[in-house]
Regions:
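Ribonuclease/tRNase effector modules and their secretory precursors
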Residues: 1-87
Length: 87
């Protein structure tokens, strides 16, 4: 697992909207089955990461900057994302 970085205000907003902050979301990288899929992006390369924390599936959008994992957003996984993860 690499070094993480994120915007503190965005992390607080994510907690309010989705029930998880970016510090908690780092536990996704403890999932040995963690999936990473390249996401559509017009500026920097972004990736959709799908994994479990406990018994819940979560999806995160991340990018990589200077060797760090930058968290952009985290939410509960959609049905199709769970199917991809479980498949």
């Amino acid at each position: 697992m690499g070094k993480f970085e994120f915007d503190d205000d965005k992390s607080k907003a994510n907690l309010k909207k989705h029930g998880i902050d970016f510090s908690e979301a780092q536990a996704l990288w403890n999932d040995p089955r963690l999936l990473e899929i390249q996401a559509k992006s017009e500026d920097e390369p972004r990736f959709l990461v799908i994994g479990c924390i406990g018994s819940r599936h979560w999806s995160a959008v991340v990018t990589y900057r200077n060797g760090a994992i930058r968290l952009i957003s985290v939410r509960r996984s959609r049905k199709r994302e769970v199917e991809i993860y479980e498949g």
